[in-house]
């Protein structure tokens, strides 16, 4: 995208996402203003890890955000806000099956697909959009249920944080089958 537009990733994110959706505390590069609210991560043993101060934007791993900001983004993702209807449909339409490169097929595979930029999962609560993040001592997960107008966002500052996801899904959305968590652990 940088090559096509001549703009940096940070500039594109600010112009197309952060400003339009009111994400005032989000950036792909470190800002000193984040110092007051940033949390240290914790490794598998529970020991604090340093906070990374990325000076260059990396789309896959350098996003700094708050739960409030990221939830605003999730609501736009869930509804397709700011997108043409045809583009918004791409966020809910399987584009490819979730194949694991070099890994054997799993029981969860038939229930997981990829749309444009987001995972799709069949759940007992309906079709869900989902994604996860893993920055070592920080783990993240989100799931939206567009049919129920609900979303769950989980940020943790622990290398063990992903162990909470299934239990939190069951508590928040209710008992049921959430194939995304099984897919992640297989």
What are the roles of these predicted feature ranges?
Residues 3-41, 45, 80-82:
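Active-site helix/loop module of the DD-peptidase/beta-lactamase fold
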Residues 14-15, 19, 45, 50-186:
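Catalytic loop of the DD-peptidase/beta-lactamase superfamily, centered on the K-T-G motif
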């Amino acid at each position: 995208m940088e090559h096509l537009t001549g703009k940096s990733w940070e500039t594109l994110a600010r112009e197309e996402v952060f400003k339009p959706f009111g994400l005032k505390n989000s950036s792909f590069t470190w800002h000193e203003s984040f110092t007051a609210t940033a949390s240290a991560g914790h490794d598998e043993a529970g020991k604090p890890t340093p906070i990374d101060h990325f000076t260059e934007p990396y789309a896959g791993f350098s996003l700094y955000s708050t739960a409030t900001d990221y939830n605003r983004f999730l609501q736009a993702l869930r509804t397709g806000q700011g997108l043409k209807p045809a583009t918004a449909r791409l966020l809910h339409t399987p584009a490819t099956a979730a194949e694991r490169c070099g890994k054997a097929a799993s029981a969860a595979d038939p229930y997981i697909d990829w749309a444009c930029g987001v995972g799709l999962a069949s759940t007992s609560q309906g079709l869900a959009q989902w994604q996860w993040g893993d920055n070592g001592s920080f783990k993240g997960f989100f799931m939206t249920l567009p049919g129920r107008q609900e979303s769950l966002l989980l940020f943790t500052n622990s290398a063990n944080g992903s162990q909470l996801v299934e239990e939190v899904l069951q508590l928040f959305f209710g008992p049921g089958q959430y194939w995304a968590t099984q897919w992640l652990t297989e």
